Amino acid sequence: QIENDRFIFNHAKILADGSIQGYTANLLNKEYYSGARNGKLIYDDDTMFDILKECEEHGYSVSIHTNGNGATEQVLRVVKRLREENPTSIYRHTVEHVQLATENQLSRLHELNIGANFFANHLYYWGDVHAEYTVGPYEVKRMEPMRSAVNHGVRFGMHSDDPITEVNPLFSAWCACNRKSGISGKVYGEDQCLTADEAMRCITLNAAWLLHLEDRLGSIETGKWADFTVLAEEVTEADTEGGHCQTGHVLVRPQGNSQEAVQQSHQQGS
């Protein structure tokens, strides 16, 4: 028995597709903006069904990598079958990244009690690439549709996809509040921005819920672990646009354009 308070076995992880920037994610519209061929699903529906069912039988919820909305659609089909077979299941599965989920898909995620874990940092690093090459200038505004997820009642967190980008919850929260490219400074989908309070919930209580640890972590309550961070100021009242934390540095927005800001951050070692 090697499980303890710091090393908990209650989830499995599988991949349903690849990455959008690698042109291997599976998209509903069958091709990329550049004309590149659609990525393939890794499993057929029956195989994924068998995997999820076996995981539940052994006491595991499953986090499922779904970058493209074609992969998200597959998860919705499969979990619906699972719930029709076992409607009283206690297991909560999660779609990871879920970057192009449609309004209809978000509604069904809520209905099936499937959690979502958005790659909040993505637009900061790849927003310009997605606008020009992978999904186009319209669809990029719908990437990481966190405001829509709130509207549909989806429980969700956010992440950095380490080691793709570094673990830094406050930076991920900043990205979710601003949706700004770190290269061009363009904002992609302002109507999908979160408030600071919503972003903080994503990296605290919602994150604990996704891990089935909400009875121990995620909020300051009697009986829960004293697992919290003391910050220099009230995050929900801070200027969410003016600066952010990255690699241990607080980067305050300088005078000039965002390219200069990125260059300054690189000079500081971030």
Model-predicted segments: where are they?
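Short, conserved catalytic or adaptor-binding loops enriched in Gly and charged residues
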Residues: 1-5, 85-86, 241
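Metal-coordinating catalytic core of metallo-dependent amide/deamination hydrolases
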Residues: 1-69, 73, 77, 108-115, ...
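Short helix/loop capping segments that flank catalytic or ligand/cofactor-binding pockets
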Residues: 17, 22-24, 167, 239, ...
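Residues that cap or delimit alpha-helices
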Residues: 44, 238-239
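His/Asp/Glu-enriched, well-ordered alpha-helical/loop segment
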Residues: 53-63, 70-93, 97-98, 103-107, ...
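Cationic, amphipathic, low-complexity alpha-helical segments enriched
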Residues: 250-254, 262-267
